[in-house]
C-alpha cells in the first residue's frame, strides 16, 4: 500500500465505473412511453442482485450529511450478499469512492482507490462484494437506496464487511 495521497476526483462515467458496478442515469437508456403518452419510462437502468442467502429487495431512504473537508479515507465497506444502489433525490453533486479487492480478497486494495464525481442526476449500483466508502455528500442530501434484507434471524453483519486502517490512506480535497 502506498502512503497518504490526494485522490484525483474524476467524472463518473459508465466505462470508468464498470468494474465496480453500474452507473444509473438516463443517458443511453431504453425509453418507453407509458400512461397514454404522458410519462417517459427510462427502462431497466440497473438490476438488483439480492437473492443470495434468501435475501429480498428493500427500498430505504438515507439522509446524508457532509463530512468536513478534506475528507480522510481510512475505512471501506462491502456487501458480499447483494448489490446496493444509491439514487439521489435532489439535484446535488456527490462523491463515490471505490477500490478493488486485494489479492486474497480480505481487504480493499488501496493502491487502486478511485474517487468519482457524480452529478445529482446520476446514481450508482455497487456490485456485490465491491469495496466502497460510505455515502459522501457535499451538502445535506437524501438518497433512495435499493439493497438487500436478509431472512428473519440473519444478523446485519452477514451482508456487511468493514475494513478500517489505523491512519488515513488518502484524502479528498474539495
Task: Outline where the language-model segments fall.
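Non-catalytic, conserved peripheral segments adjacent to functional cores
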Residues: 1-111, 115, 147-174
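His/acidic/aromatic-lined binding-pocket segments of jelly-roll/cupin-type domains
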Residues: 84-87, 123-124, 135
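Conserved metal-binding segment of the jelly-roll/cupin
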Residues: 117-131
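Solvent-exposed, flexible loop/coil residues
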Residues: 120, 135, 139, 164
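Ligand-binding loop in jelly-roll beta-barrel domains
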Residues: 129-144
Amino acid at each position: 500500500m502506498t502512503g497518504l495521497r490526494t485522490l484525483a476526483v474524476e467524472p463518473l462515467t459508465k466505462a470508468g465505473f464498470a468494474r465496480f458496478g453500474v452507473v444509473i442515469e438516463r443517458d443511453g437508456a431504453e425509453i418507453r412511453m407509458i400512461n397514454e403518452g404522458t410519462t417517459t419510462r427510462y427502462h431497466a437502468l440497473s438490476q438488483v442482485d439480492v437473492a443470495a442467502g434468501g435475501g429480498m429487495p428493500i427500498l430505504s431512504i438515507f439522509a446524508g450529511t457532509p463530512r468536513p473537508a478534506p475528507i480522510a479515507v481510512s475505512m471501506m465497506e462491502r456487501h458480499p450478499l447483494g448489490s446496493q444502489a444509491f439514487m439521489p433525490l435532489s439535484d446535488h453533486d456527490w462523491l463515490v469512492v471505490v477500490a478493488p479487492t486485494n489479492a486474497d480478497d480480505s481487504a480493499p486494495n488501496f493502491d487502486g482507490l478511485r474517487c468519482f464525481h457524480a452529478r445529482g442526476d446520476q446514481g450508482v449500483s455497487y456490485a456485490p462484494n465491491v469495496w466502497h466508502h460510505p455515502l459522501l455528500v457535499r451538502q445535506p442530501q437524501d438518497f433512495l437506496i435499493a439493497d438487500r434484507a436478509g431472512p428473519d434471524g440473519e444478523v446485519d453483519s452477514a451482508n456487511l464487511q468493514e475494513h478500517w486502517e489505523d491512519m488515513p490512506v488518502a484524502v479528498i480535497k474539495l
